[in-house]
């Protein structure tokens, strides 16, 4: 790879953005960042706490700033939060500053991958599937709108998906 380009991973909760992102960064010798982890690092608290204390609006404000800061770096792989796509500012930054890869997955796979994860505030409800379906209606068209590449993550290991991304990007 002659120049260091940014790769931004978008997609719903449970698509594998963080896991695939780590593999991708390692394989391409790029720096890996996770926007949720960066928010936790900056606040000194976990995402659930930020949601409890500041609400979703406060969390989204922090997320917008973190993504703006991280996308100014060069030579990174960034795993974004599933809901970050709803911010026009974030969509603009992702589109303008790197290659956007949409990691697509089914609702069934999302449910299976997130059912035991207590760190997902939006899913701490009686029927997480219903929440995921509603979020998909809103967010999937936005992921598709800004994606340079779309890769399905169902039934594949993170390493296989990372290799598919590399192949599709021609790296």
UniProtKB/Swiss-Prot annotation:
Pathway: Metabolic intermediate biosynthesis; chorismate biosynthesis; chorismate from D-erythrose 4-phosphate and phosphoenolpyruvate: step 5/7. Its cofactor is Mg(2+). ATP binds at residues 14-19, 120, 156. CDD domains: SK (cd00464). Binds 1 Mg(2+) ion per subunit. InterPro entries: P-loop_NTPase, Shikimate/glucono_kinase, Shikimate_kinase/TSH1, Shikimate_kinase_CS. One of its GO terms (molecular function) is magnesium ion binding. It is found in: Cytoplasm. Mg(2+) binds at residue 18. Its EC number is 2.7.1.71. The keyword ATP-binding applies. Substrate binds at residues 36, 60, 82, 139. Transmembrane segments: none annotated. It catalyses: shikimate + ATP = 3-phosphoshikimate + ADP + H(+). Keywords: Amino-acid biosynthesis, Aromatic amino acid biosynthesis, ATP-binding, Cytoplasm, Kinase, Magnesium, Metal-binding, Nucleotide-binding, Transferase. Catalyzes the specific phosphorylation of the 3-hydroxyl group of shikimic acid using ATP as a cosubstrate. Belongs to the shikimate kinase family. NCBIfam families: PRK05057.1. This is Shikimate kinase. It comes from Shewanella loihica (strain ATCC BAA-1088 / PV-4).
